[in-house]
């Protein structure tokens, strides 16, 4: 298992910034009204920063930094180095209860949970393809799926099982991953260069992440959106 390391002091400083400090820099725009992401100017970086919220997906050809916080959820970072486009999603599998999560398995392709996960992955991939990326050139880095206490521990485990099985089945070029474990993460991604930085954080600093994911989990409608999505076999 490959783990992405943080090597630049500015990245460390940013990762340790509290969500309350970052919140003062939030500048919502009209296209962000759905709440999937928001963009702001970082005080010590010349680029725009975009935070992807649970259930969101964001792809860009601009020089930006995409970031998110991950508890039980997983994120796939994908990019085409030649076209200089990249993006990130942030999702979890929807389960109605602990019994359902215990009996789900990655090969249950027709289950609502698997279909939701496939949709989250295909939205990211198709969005990059629409921006000129070639599927054969796409590279992926996978993050998240922490085994948190209680019911959420099963959710994190199942999210990891799903994303690994999906990557294997669809023959995705996964070049790095940092999955599982017992701690939430903060994740930064440069979509043009394909560089990613991850910092595991303590539970005392992860209240906002946990709250966002709980709200997302309660709001998930397991009816897959009607938009046509191509599943690559």
From Swiss-Prot:
Its EC number is 3.5.1.44. The keyword Hydrolase applies. One of its GO terms (biological process) is chemotaxis. GO terms for molecular function: protein-glutamine glutaminase activity. It is an enzyme of class 3 (hydrolase). It comes from the Bacteria. This is Probable chemoreceptor glutamine deamidase CheD. It comes from Vibrio cholerae serotype O1 (strain ATCC 39541 / Classical Ogawa 395 / O395).
